[in-house]
Amino acid sequence: MLKFAVLLSVLACALAGTIPDGLLPQLDGRIVGGYETSIDAHPYQVSLQRYGSHFCGGSIYSHDIVITAAHCLQSIEAKDLKIRVGSTYWRSGGSVHSVRSFRNHEGYNSRTMVNDIAIIRIESDLSFRSSIREIRIADSNPREGATAVVSGWGTTESGGSTIPDHLLAVDLEIIDVSRCRSDEFGYGKKIKDTMLCAYAPHKDACQGDSGGPLVSGDRLVGVVSWGYGCGDVRYPGVYADVAHFHEWIERTAEEV
């Protein structure tokens, strides 16, 4: 199955009819093949929450801006969103902030998953400290084979229904887009130029890590977007390519 699985008690109705058959948004899952980590190691990581439940990740861009995936915010109103920052645990700790507004990329397509990126403005400025920091966005793609890390909260298996409290992370390698769409893997032409792939055998982001950070060289290089299964050797994880959206992020962060 695809790694996108909606937390049924929270978002199933909101997302019905907007995602292609077999391609459900990855809104509440876990890192596959990874390890427990702390927010001090990933101080840019946030938890997007609705009705008190974690459903997506995100990355701190500035004192009042968070970057996430567009598919996380379909059929959702800003007043229903909360952002927890500064905690290793999505359920407690740190601080929780209301959302003033958000904007999905104008070219986002829920069928092809192109332009799967969004900007959130929170109500109050964040106070930066060791557990709450912005991350710089990439202005060029990392090289093929570069080490990257993805972090998030989620279930213990693809399609699972419970999520751990503790933040998890996994180390991956960047795969060039042309290689990701080659016969070596199973995606073919589904991989577009707005996307970035990362891979390690039996390691991956999974349901619930959506919108979260893929970081390489201390830069945000990707936003967790989609993929078939979790940790399937035939299918790398697919991310929104942050370098491709660099100008859009800067502009939208001023406008939203």
Curated annotation (Swiss-Prot):
Signal sequence range: 1-22
EC number: 3.4.21.4
Site (Required for specificity): 204
Superkingdom field: Eukaryota
Cited Pfam families: Trypsin (PF00089)
Peptidase S1 domain: residues covered: 31-254
Propeptide section residues: 23-30
InterPro entries: Peptidase_S1 (IPR050430), Peptidase_S1_PA (IPR009003), Peptidase_S1_PA_chymotrypsin (IPR043504), Peptidase_S1A (IPR001314), Trypsin_dom (IPR001254), TRYPSIN_HIS (IPR018114), TRYPSIN_SER (IPR033116)
Leading EC class: hydrolase
Annotated GO CC locations: extracellular region
Disulphide bonds in the chain: 56-72, 180-197, 206-230
SUPFAM superfamilies linked: Trypsin-like serine proteases
Gene3D superfamilies reported for this sequence: Trypsin-like serine proteases
One BP term from GO: proteolysis
Entry annotated with the keyword Signal: yes
Annotated catalytic residues: 71 (charge relay system), 116 (charge relay system), 210 (charge relay system)
Secreted recorded as keyword: yes
Catalytic activity as recorded in UniProt: Preferential cleavage: Arg-|-Xaa, Lys-|-Xaa
Localization (cell): Secreted, Extracellular space
GO molecular-function term, one example from the UniProt record: serine-type endopeptidase activity
Keywords associated with the record: Disulfide bond, Hydrolase, Protease, Secreted, Serine protease, Signal, Zymogen
PANTHER family named among the record's database cross-references: AT26814P-RELATED (PTHR24276:SF91), POLYSERASE-RELATED (PTHR24276)
Family: Belongs to the peptidase S1 family.
Protein name: Trypsin epsilon
Organismal lineage: Eukaryota, Metazoa, Ecdysozoa, Arthropoda, Hexapoda
